[in-house]
């Protein structure tokens, strides 16, 4: 992870998968589970993907990261690591096959990012694996250098084959399944946004669920907002889902 001078930024945009969905891209985990890339694993009798497919069909929705925790706790699969690694590889293939020509330029996500591109005091924390943010910023006339100075791909990019996919470090998984933890990934470098949070005056969140899997990134952000009323943060959450912000925004 390159060094970034946070001193010049006054605001931050946090982007999650809802951003790509707003653009009209098929980036939900259900899209992946129903894809040809996932079907290849099913045809190979990959037990992990069979488990995920069954649960997705039962619920008509799936949070793969949460299901990985449950699978670790409840299943005994000697091939778990191998099958998990195969899942990660196919996820990269799936994302790299996304057709960006279908991006909805009339979407709210596109509007937000294009408006943001015209100012230089904003930094973007992108939790997606896709190339959508980089592509739109290029369409807005930003150079590769400008984009690299303003865009942090927190979990890596599929185009570079360096995605960080797994569970949070404090997840209750079996000790032999440590490979599931994001910090276990050799490409993972813990990002300390404390300096950024100390300097920025506003935070916008688009399409990020603020879930437990990214708890460490947002802990200081929300705790200080509550204690010092530093920022006004609004978030709309789906019912019956566990999210981080209700734990601190009371």
Where do the language-model regions lie?
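Conserved catalytic-core helix/loop/strand module for nucleotide-ribose chemistry
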Residues: 1-13, 17-202, 208-250
């Amino acid at each position: 992870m390159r060094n970034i001078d946070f001193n010049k930024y006054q605001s931050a945009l946090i982007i999650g998968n809802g951003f790509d969905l707003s653009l009209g891209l098929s980036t939900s985990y259900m899209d992946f589970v129903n894809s040809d890339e996932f079907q290849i694993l099913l045809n190979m009798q990959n037990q992990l993907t069979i488990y995920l497919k069954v649960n997705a069909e039962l619920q008509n929705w799936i949070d793969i990261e949460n299901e990985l925790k449950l699978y670790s706790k409840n299943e005994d699969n000697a091939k778990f690591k191998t099958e998990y690694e195969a899942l990660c590889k196919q996820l990269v293939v799936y994302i790299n096959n996304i057709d960006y020509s279908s991006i909805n330029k009339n979407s709210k996500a596109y509007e937000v990012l294009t408006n943001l591109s015209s100012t230089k005091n904003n930094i973007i924390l992108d939790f997606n694996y896709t190339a959508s943010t980089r592509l739109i910023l290029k369409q807005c006339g930003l150079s590769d250098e400008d984009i690299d100075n303003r865009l942090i791909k927190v979990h890596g990019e599929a185009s570079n084959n360096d995605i960080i996919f797994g569970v949070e470090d404090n997840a209750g998984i079996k000790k032999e399944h440590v490979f599931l933890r994001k910090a276990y990934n050799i490409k993972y470098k813990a990002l300390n946004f404390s300096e950024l949070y100390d300097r920025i005056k506003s935070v916008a969140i688009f399409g990020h669920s603020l879930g437990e899997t990214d708890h460490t990134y947002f802990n200081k952000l929300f705790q200080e907002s509550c204690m010092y009323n530093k920022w006004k943060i609004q978030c709309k959450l789906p019912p019956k889902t566990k999210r981080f912000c209700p734990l601190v925004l009371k």
